[in-house]
Amino acid sequence: MLIVTWDEFNLCVESITNTCRDKELCGVYGFPRGGICLAVALSHSLNIPLLQEPKSGCLVVDDVYETGKTLKTISENKKITIFVWFSKSKPQWWNAVNIIDPDEWIIFPW
């Protein structure tokens, strides 16, 4: 079991911010529920709008990539930048701050 803290959350936000700072992003969208916390924090740190739905040219975030079902819904849009905090498989068309074992259970701070 992996128990993550708010300090680790802040490091994740900092990592994504540093990677995306120079990108021209129209906003950030977070998949409900886990991606919303990341999206709000990144909206503030990148000074971009929080979006109610993903659109071309935006940053899309989620807490974890497991089966790919959630992110697959937007994977066809090549103009979207996708980040997850934890990925349970090697990133292919998305970005991950951390890659973990597929069997790992994650306890988030929220």
Task: Put a short name on every predicted segment.
Residues 1-110:
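PRPP-associated nucleotide enzymes
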